[in-house]
Amino acid sequence: EFARRVTKLPGIGNLAVRRKIFRKIIDGLGGHLRLIICGAAPLLPETAAGLNDFGIVTIQGYGLTETSPVVAAERPEDLAAGSVGKPMPSVEVTIENKDENGIGEIVVKGPNVMMGYLDQPEETANVIKDGRFYTGDLGKFDDEGHLWITGRKKNVIVMKNGKNVFPEEIESIIDKLPYTSESMLFTREKHNELVLWVKIVYKPEYLEDTGVTFAEFVQTVRGVLAAINEKLPKYKHLHRFLLTDEPMIKTTTQKVKRNLEIEKINQQWQEELCYNNSI
């Protein structure tokens, strides 16, 4: 909070002053750290904002191998913590098939876009149309032109009322909890409607460090998820949660293999190997 106030004071909201005021923090990070560039995975907005407030310029960017690779990036003079900044020069970024919140698929056009996948014409045709590359990522632009990534198109959950749920939106909230290692949303059918469940991989050391029993821990999680529900529209409400300390199945790039996880959940559910709790 003090950092926020310092950066807003007239005449001293500059890097040199911030680095001097927060010298102890910077020294704790080695003393010479001036710039952080983050890509591949999102950085929590509060983390980026905090580092910038301390005088360590923290920039997020976005790109893919198919786009050589940078599509957009923050600039030191134009930071928007949580976004991936604005498109690079000569790169055109549009949002296709927007929903009511302005979220749609990110499409890229420019000299940085690949010619195609080697010897894979069908795969190339699926992602490149009229020279425009369909990334499969979902995002939106804010009023200042900053690009925000909201998830992957293939991960979108379409409810029976036609509403879209972007699992990463809710998972990112749950993943911030001190006892959460990772989480994943999925659906179950109830009274001919789809409802949301969440699998939470918890940190066993949290129970050891706090001294709470597992039963007490379950009640804590239930209460926190109920509080999260209060801030979400009804169709995004979580109905049940599964607790486990077993890591999820991931790709080599540490992305959760959702389909395999759902198969695993179905098996555990039948064999009663997971803790199933209502909210």
Predicted feature locations:
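Conserved AMP-binding/adenylate-forming
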Residues: 13, 17-147, 153-156, 176
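Extended hydrophobic secondary-structure segments that form protein cores and membrane-embedded regions
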Residues: 35-37, 198-199, 240-244
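Short, internal active-site loops enriched in acidic
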Residues: 42-43, 189-190, 203-204, 244-250
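AMP-binding/adenylate-forming catalytic core of the ANL superfamily
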Residues: 110, 115-116, 138-234
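Alpha-helical "lid/cap" subdomains adjacent to substrate-binding clefts that gate access
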Residues: 1-34, 199-229
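Conserved C-terminal "lid"/linker of ANL adenylate-forming enzymes
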Residues: 184-187, 226-279
